[in-house]
Curated annotation (Swiss-Prot):
Coiled coil segments of this chain: 893-958
NCBIfam families to which the protein is assigned, alphabetical: PRK05729.1, valS
Binding site for ATP: K572
Gene3D superfamilies from the UniProt entry: HUPs, Isoleucyl-tRNA Synthetase, Domain 1, Valyl-tRNA synthetase, C-terminal domain
SUPFAM superfamilies per the UniProt record, alphabetical: Anticodon-binding domain of a subclass of class I aminoacyl-tRNA synthetases (SSF47323), Nucleotidylyl transferase (SSF52374), tRNA-binding arm (SSF46589), ValRS/IleRS/LeuRS editing domain (SSF50677)
Enzyme class: ligase
Subunit relationships: Monomer.
Reactions catalysed according to its record: tRNA(Val) + L-valine + ATP = L-valyl-tRNA(Val) + AMP + diphosphate
Record bears the keyword Nucleotide-binding: yes
Alphabetical UniProt keywords: Aminoacyl-tRNA synthetase, ATP-binding, Coiled coil, Cytoplasm, Ligase, Nucleotide-binding, Protein biosynthesis
Name used for this protein in its record: Valine--tRNA ligase
Superkingdom classification of source: Bacteria
Predominant localisation class: cytoplasm
Length: 960
């Protein structure tokens, strides 16, 4: 696509600069693309056509700071797909957005206030929320800037924030409808509670950590005096009471019962009897339930329904009282004995254990490893807490009048994957998705925070609840119900993942039936890390299908997580994070140290982090540019695996960009000023070969995009550009331009520029900036745009393989030429010739092939001449055999000196072989050395042996 305009961001008369400097190019071209509207839906497609939509939604980054390497990886994959489909002619929509990230954002802003010795309670809710909005504006613009730096061709007019007015409307509408359908309800339930944040947290936000704890064994005396039981060995045993074991003795203050298995013969006669609750003026019953393991410990457990998830279910089944013993900040409340009231939970533990021991209720204490649940945001040990919360019913059948009546939202989500409407890449994630949905619990969606979507529910003074889209609507409901007086809004906010789950359809205008919603839902693919399949992916499927009847996306591409070079998770506390912008622009050592040691949760870690950073990056991080970073990310994108990120890979792909730049300079120098549009000219076998290879590249790249194998795309581009086009074809083209006829020169020049132009289009989705800059110059010469016209590679047709251009004969001819060149280079190495020394080659074999290849051999193997003979002379020189050809360098040598040199080399190699055999024959070395070191030594031995055989062969040819 081209459109005439006077302003072209490239000086067409200026020569391409000598070196690739990405910074200036990136800023200039991103602004230009956005200004021209290439990223906007519908703007880049041909008028009068009805292209198919191709839609990708950002997984919205949290507005809690800056993008990390995982975001850079995600953006590379998503933008690569979008640019590819834009060039295919699809109507691409790449929807950007950011997430309000309730808990995470509130923590960040509260920390800022803490530094000023101010709490959110000092400010009040309204002022605090204002502060968060201020911070969001600052952080959100930083993130947007970073996304642009990564080259994301996003449809910026569609940018959203999950608390924008239009998004908030969709959230409220969804909540109200689900409530009216009986699929959202409020109830007193046991939840994971963060006593620092004072909010419920999702099961998925719980991180379990193994710790060294204790098991306390406590005696609960029988109220009726000692009882007898028959133990497992058949002995009659008299018990003063029941002994239970617990890792949390402080919670015994809330016990409601003791429980045994109903089929445990030891305790059947004790069912219904009462025991004393130590330290409390209460008696509790002995009950039976199948959940008890009779073979674990004494086969008796305590039931603390308000502070343990297993106990909670048991207590409900048996109507056992739920006694809450903790305040919301985890101190003993008024339900505990007076002596413990007001104590923090761990202080209470010490006091309870001391009192149990003093009153002889403590039987014994044992060390015990245990899993401790912690909040992933605060690291605080979570407390099961009985509170009033809002829930989404995950397994309840939807009522009549909904889009899927009689089916739960979970059933519908499972069916969408089972029948192929949604496909996972790689496929194994389907199993994980299904396992989670088949074991799902109702979703607690309320959070006791100030930042987020406030729950659209209002309460009357007598406790009636009115769920409505607005306070006015709630008032109308109250009046209709005969309720007078003020209404108070529920202070809680919704789980961040609730609003995020609505993104696939609320971003396109739902609940209105908009043209965008009809055209762009479902998205084509969701690109995401496996860590949020449950948090986000499954919930998007459930809610999108329930509210709209459509799947949210057709494909889910699941990638691994970015780790450091040693495979460690990147985290601020480890000091091993990398900012993608630092890899693009570079950062000096002092700046990197400051960035890694600033704002640590534990400032004591700063010294170790600084030391490690100075050791790892003594010169800081060089500027690689966006294209090199993107190429690196694409090359790492194997299906589903975690990625150990190594900066050396970035350096390699920066070198690739330099190679492409320099190749373009060479091509332009040899093609500019020549009339290369139209047909004509004579194509050599080398010209036909590089065009034939291009077809294979185009097919491989197309297959890679279709299969989400971005590593294959990147590797195919790298191999073709570096190995085939630059290292071989450019060298062959030099020969053809210098020695060919005018028709041959024209054919080669046309091939040089046309293949390069196609390569730039092929590589554009991966490395957009350098390809745009180079294409502007190359396209003029290749006849793909006219001088003065505005055009962009980003909206050019994507190259497709042409089977008619595959040339097996040319492929075979170049393969043979390559083998001959490499054979002559091997001869030069064997004869220890310097690179500058030009020597003649004598060749025996097929005359037509050798004569055709002679000028290329002379140029690429640094030969003074190539003589084709009927038979090689008996000169005692080494010979290389390539197919039917025999090749020999005709070099006059001092035989005595060469014999002496070879004898010396033989002695050296024999010494190396003896040393290697000595090591490998040493059992201690083989057993104790790392396997990699042993394998390396074996490889050295094999290499020395192979070289020795060749050198001995040369020595034999020279005689005594």
């Amino acid at each position: 696509m081209t459109d005439a305009a006077p302003n072209q961001p490239v000086n067409e008369s200026q020569e391409l600069s000598k070196s690739f400097e990405p910074a200036e190019i990136e800023t200039r071209w991103y602004d230009e693309w956005a200004k021209r509207g290439y990223f906007d839906a519908g703007r880049h497609v041909e008028t009068g056509t009805d292209p198919q939509p191709y839609v990708i939604q950002f997984p919205p980054p949290n507005v809690t700071g800056t993008l990390h390497m995982g975001h850079a990886f995600n953006q590379t994959i998503m933008d690569g797909l979008v640019r590819y489909h834009r060039m295919l002619g699809d109507d691409t929509v790449f929807v950007p957005g950011t997430d309000h990230a309730g808990i995470a954002t509130q923590i960040v802003v509260e920390r800022q206030l803490d530094a000023q010795k101010v709490s959110r309670h000092d400010l009040g809710r309204e002022k605090f929320v204002e502060k968060v909005w201020e911070w969001k504006e600052q952080s959100g613009s930083t993130i947007t800037g970073q996304v642009r730096r990564l080259g994301a061709s996003a449809d910026w007019p569609r940018e959203y924030f999950t608390m924008d007015a239009r998004m908030s409307r969709g959230v409220a509408e969804t909540f109200v409808r689900l409530y009216q359908q009986g699929l959202i309800y409020r109830g007193k339930r046991l939840v994971n509670w963060d006593p620092k944040l004072l909010t419920a947290v999702s099961d998925l936000e719980v991180q379990s950590e193994e710790v060294d704890g204790h098991m306390w064994h406590i005696l609960y005396p029988f109220v009726d005096g000692p009882q007898t039981i028959i133990d497992a060995e058949g002995n009659t045993v008299t018990l003063r009471g029941m002994t239970i074991a617990t890792t949390r003795p402080e919670t015994m203050l809330a016990d409601g019962a003791l429980c045994v298995h109903p089929d445990d013969p030891r305790y059947k006669h004790l069912l219904g009897k009462l025991v004393e609750l130590p330290l409390c003026d209460r008696n509790i019953p002995i009950i039976a339930d199948d959940f008890v393991d009779p073979d674990f410990g004494t086969g008796c457990v305590k039931i603390t329904g308000a502070h343990d998830f297993n106990d909670y279910a048991c207590a409900l089944r048996h109507d056992i009282p739920l006694i809450v013993i903790f305040t919301l900040d985890a101190h003993i409340n008024e339900n505990g004995p007076k002596q413990f009231q007001g104590l923090e939970r761990y202080e209470a533990r010490q006091a309870v254990v001391a009192e149990l021991q003093a009153q002889q209720y403590l039987v014994k204490v044992e060390p015990h490893k245990m899993m401790q649940p912690k909040g992933d945001r605060t690291g605080v040990v979570l407390e099961p807490m009985l509170t009033d919360q809002w829930f989404v019913a995950m397994s309840k059948p939807a009522p009549a009048g909904t889009l899927n009546p009689g089916k739960s939202i979970t059933e519908v989500a499972l069916e969408a994957v089972a029948d192929g409407r949604i496909a996972f890449y790689p496929e194994n994630w389907t199993t994980i998705y299904n396992q989670w949905l088949n074991n799902i619990q109702d979703w607690c969606i309320s959070r006791q925070l100030w930042w987020g979507h406030q729950i659209p529910a209002w309460y009357s003074e007598d406790g009636q609840v009115f769920v409505a889209r607005s306070e006015q609507e709630a008032q109308e409901q109250a009046r209709a119900a005969g309720v007078a007086g003020p209404l108070t809004r529920d202070p809680d906010v919704l789980d961040t993942w609730f609003s995020s789950a609505l993104v696939p359809f609320t971003t396109f205008g739902w609940p209105e039936d908009t043209p965008d919603l009809r055209r762009y839902l479902p998205s084509s693919v969701l690109v995401t890390g496996f860590d949020i399949i449950f948090f986000w992916v499954a919930r998007m499927v459930m809610l999108t299908m329930h509210m709209t009847g459509s799947v949210p996306f057709k494909h889910v591409y699941v990638h691994g997580l970015i780790r450091d070079a040693d495979g460690q998770k990147m985290s601020k506390s480890k000091g091993n994070t990398l900012d993608p912008v630092d890899l693009i622009d570079g950062i000096d050592l002092e700046g990197l140290v400051r960035k890694r040691t600033f704002g640590l949760m534990n400032p004591k870690q700063a010294g170790a982090i600084e030391k490690a950073t100075r050791r790892q990056y003594p010169d800081g991080i060089p500027a690689f540019g966006t294209d090199a970073l993107r190429f690196t990310m694409a090359a790492y994108a194997t299906l589903g695996r975690n990625i150990n990120f190594d900066l050396k890979r970035c350096e390699g792909y920066r070198n690739f960009c330099n190679k492409l730049w320099n190749a373009t300079r060479f091509v332009l120098m040899n093609t500019e000023g020549h009339a290369l549009d139209g047909d004509g000219g004579e194509l050599s076998f080398a010209d036909r070969w590089i065009v034939s290879q291009l077809q294979a590249l185009e097919a491989e790249v197309e297959r890679g995009f279709a299969d989400y194998r971005f590593d294959n795309v990147a590797n195919a581009l790298y191999r073709y550009v570096w190995d085939e086009y630059c290292d071989w074809y450019l060298e062959l083209a030099k020969v053809q331009i210098q020695q060919g006829t005018p028709a041959q020169q024209l054919g080669t020049r046309r091939t040089l520029i046309r293949v390069l132009e196609a390569v730039l289009r092929l590589a554009h989705p991966v490395i957009p900036f350098i390809t745009e800059e180079l294409w502007q110059k190359v396209a003029l010469v290749a006849g793909k745009r006219t001088a003065g016209a505005v055009a962009s590679v980003s909206v050019q047709p994507y190259p497709r393989a042409n089977p008619q251009a595959v040339d097996a004969e040319a492929e075979a001819a170049v393969a043979e030429l390559k083998s001959q060149v490499e054979a002559v280079r091997a001869l030069r190495g064997e004869m220890n010739l310097s690179p500058a020394q030009r020597v003649p080659l004598v060749a025996e074999g097929p005359t037509d092939v050798l004569s055709r290849n002679a000028p290329y051999l002379a140029a690429l193997a640094k030969l003074s001449e190539v003589e084709v003979v009927a038979a090689l002379p008996d000169a005692g020189a080494p010979v290389q055999v390539v197919g039917d050809a025999r090749l020999m360098l005709h070099v006059e040598i001092d035989v005595a000196a060469e014999c002496a040199r070879l004898d010396k080399e033989i002695a050296r190699l024999e010494g190396e072989i003896a040393k290697a055999n000595g090591k490998l024959g040493n059992a201690s070395f083989v057993e104790r050395a790392p396997a990699a070191v042993v394998e390396q030594e074996k490889a050295r031995l094999a290499q020395f042996s192979e070289t020795l055989e060749k050198v001995r062969g040369q020595r034999v040819k020279l005689g005594a």
